[in-house]
Each structure stands twice: as structure tokens, then as C-alpha cells.
Amino acid sequence: MGAVKRSHHQVDVDTEGKDSHRFREAGANPVALTGGGLFFFTEKTEVVYNPALIARWFAGKADIVIMEGFKSESVPRLQFADLAHMAEKDDNYVVGFITAETAGFPREFGGKPVFNRDDAEGIGEWLVGSFIPSLGKGI
């Protein structure tokens, strides 16, 4: 599984005072940092990366990519919502709901599954079974 977090704020995974930060501050673009079994790649860009383009970077490295922060994109998504607001949060791209409710909530809303936010195992099994059927066998 891969993961992407989209932010509407300036982000920086580099540390001031480190060589890679100094390279970038001096105008190097892009800058990569590797070591200890990790690889980071940063690039200043005006490009707005959409989920399909980002997912290509994960090809061959992850069976599924979880992306947070792309709610205006036309991609399948699990929608966080309390019970009172599920109907207004539902649209053609919502494939299921996640709620903070801990007991007595419906397991389905509008034909879509509803999960408690702490049910990582249930959410994971549903994702695999729904989006990676070949891996879902035997779960």
C-alpha cells in the first residue's frame, strides 16, 4: 500500500542547515536525498498533480494508493461524515463512509458500506476485496 497526503499549504520535508536544504536554497531543482534505505525527491513546480498522475509513480511499488486531500477530484473515495451529514456528503464518487460513531450506526448507507474510523481491519479488507480482487481471496 502507498499513501499520498495533499496539502494546501507550503510543505517542506527538508531540514534547515542540512546539505540538501542548502542545495535547494541555492537554486538546485529538483533535489533528491537518499540514505538509510529511504529516498526523497523534491521539486519546485507550478504543476498541480492529479491523482492519476501521482498513482503512476507508485506503479509496480504498491497494489493500492491511499490519497488524502483530493475531495474535489473525480476519483473513488471513502467519505468521512457523521450520521446526520452522510446524505449531503454523498456523491457519485463516494464508495463508502467512515464515521466517528462507535455503536448503533448503520453498516450501510445508500447501498454503500459504513465503517467506524477505528476499524482499520474492516476498512482494509473491504478495500482489498473491492479494488484488488485477486488479493482479496482468502481474507
Model region roles, listed by residue range:
Residues 1-45:
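N-terminal phosphate/diphosphate-binding loop that engages ATP/GTP or pyrophosphate donors
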Residues 42-72:
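Phosphate-binding/switch loop-helix module in NTP-utilizing enzymes
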Residues 17, 48, 117, 121:
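Electropositive phosphate-/nucleotide-binding environments in soluble metabolic enzymes
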